[in-house]
Amino acid sequence: MTALFLMSMLFGLTCGQAMSFCIPTEYTMHIERRECAYCLTINTTICAGYCMTRDINGKLFLPKYALSQDVCTYRDFIYRTVEIPGCPLHVAPYFSYPVALSCKCGKCNTDYSDCIHEAIKTNYCTKPQKSYLVGFSV
């Protein structure tokens, strides 16, 4: 009985570790608006990692929904709002961004995720940088 229990426990831990590669990960993003004087550097968390998936050989005979593969995506998230410094009065200086609290492997939801294969490399500043100074949760 003890050996069976230990083997079950070991199997559960192994599967748990294999399935937990989709986790909240620290990410630095740069936010700027054309009208504002500064670029804001923000530290947040995003969902990143690997999900178990399989490629189906009989693609011609299956509906499109069966062909989608799981991606590492948000389970729970909140939005935070920051104020971009150096904006003129006629420009709204606020920017909201998601903060991942927990992640899951699932279908990519374009309502709140970028579902492209390779992102365009735009995470840089062209203006002087300011660190995240003012922010509040929405």
Curated annotation (Swiss-Prot):
GO terms for cellular component: cytoplasm; extracellular region; extracellular space. Residues 133-138 form a propeptide. GO terms for biological process: anatomical structure morphogenesis; cell-cell signaling; G protein-coupled receptor signaling pathway. Gene3D superfamilies: Cystine-knot cytokines. Coiled coil: none annotated. The keyword Signal applies. Keywords: Congenital hypothyroidism, Disease variant, Disulfide bond, Glycoprotein, Hormone, Pharmaceutical, Secreted, Signal. Disulfide bonds join 22-72, 36-87, 39-125, 47-103, 51-105, 108-115. Residues 1-20 form the signal peptide. It is found in: Secreted. GO terms for molecular function: hormone activity. Glycans are attached at residue 43. It is linked to Hypothyroidism, congenital, non-goitrous, 4: A form of central hypothyroidism, a disorder characterized by insufficient stimulation by thyroid stimulating hormone of an otherwise normal thyroid gland. CHNG4 is an autosomal recessive form characterized by isolated thyrotropin deficiency that, if untreated, results in severe growth retardation and intellectual disability. Heterodimer of a common alpha chain and a unique beta chain which confers biological specificity to thyrotropin, lutropin, follitropin and gonadotropin. Belongs to the glycoprotein hormones subunit beta family. Indispensable for the control of thyroid structure and metabolism. This is Thyrotropin subunit beta. It comes from Homo sapiens (Human).
